[in-house]
């Protein structure tokens, strides 16, 4: 993937505005609520029986932060995203048996959370670059499956 200097700047600037502790839990909670079948991967989290339970779930919030921190690795390694996520892709494929489409669902939910949070600071041209970035990350995480 080729990144223009403008795209790199857009991703870097947006990432600099993201509060991992806030956005990560919101994005993961949204996945679990909007796509309830994804809850099957998180049995150890405890109660995920309602929206309130999901939003208030400390284990879910912690994992949401972990996921978003991992996304920061891609921001810092835009020239080698596939290499950055090789082991994580293998873990999700071979150990956790996660359906790789769930990475796309998470990316979509993260985009919704960012659009909600940043409003006018997340115009279509920023979203376009962000979507490209997320697509590359999803591809890298799905790599081990094929």
Curated annotation (Swiss-Prot):
UniProt key word Mitochondrion: no
GO-annotated biological processes: hydrogen peroxide catabolic process
Other information: This fish has two types of hemoglobin: one cathodic Hb and two major anodic Hbs. The cathodic Hb displays a small normal Bohr effect and a reverse Bohr effect in the presence and absence of phosphate respectively. In addition, the cathodic HB displays a large phosphate effect.
Expressing tissues: Red blood cells.
Protein name: Hemoglobin cathodic subunit beta
Homology family: Belongs to the globin family.
Residue ranges annotated for the Globin domain, each copy included: 2-146
Chain positions recorded as heme b binding sites: 63, 92
GO molecular function: haptoglobin binding; heme binding; metal ion binding; organic acid binding; oxygen binding; oxygen carrier activity; peroxidase activity
Record flagged with keyword Heme: yes
Function: Involved in oxygen transport from the gills to the various peripheral tissues.
PROSITE patterns named in the record: GLOBIN
Organism: Conger conger (Conger eel)
A single cellular component GO annotation: blood microparticle
Description of how the protein assembles with itself and partners: Heterotetramer of two alpha chains and two beta chains.
PANTHER family reported in the protein's UniProt record: HEMOGLOBIN FAMILY MEMBER (PTHR11442), HEMOGLOBIN SUBUNIT EPSILON (PTHR11442:SF7)
Keywords: Heme, Iron, Metal-binding, Oxygen transport, Transport
């Amino acid at each position: 993937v080729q990144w223009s200097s403008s795209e790199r700047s857009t991703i870097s600037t947006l990432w600099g505005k993201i509060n991992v502790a806030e956005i990560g839990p919101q994005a993961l909670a949204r996945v679990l609520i909007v796509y309830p079948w994804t809850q099957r991967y998180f049995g150890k989290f405890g109660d995920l029986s309602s929206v309130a339970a999901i939003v208030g779930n400390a284990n879910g919030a912690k994992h949401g932060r972990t996921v978003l921190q991992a996304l920061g690795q891609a921001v810092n390694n835009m020239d080698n995203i596939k290499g950055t996520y090789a082991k994580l892709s293998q873990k999700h494929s071979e150990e956790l048996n996660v359906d790789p489409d769930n990475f796309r669902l998470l990316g979509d939910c993260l985009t919704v959370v960012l659009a909600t949070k940043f409003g006018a600071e997340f115009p279509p041209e920023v979203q376009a670059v962000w979507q490209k970035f997320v697509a590359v990350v999803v591809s890298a995480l799905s790599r081990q499956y094929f």
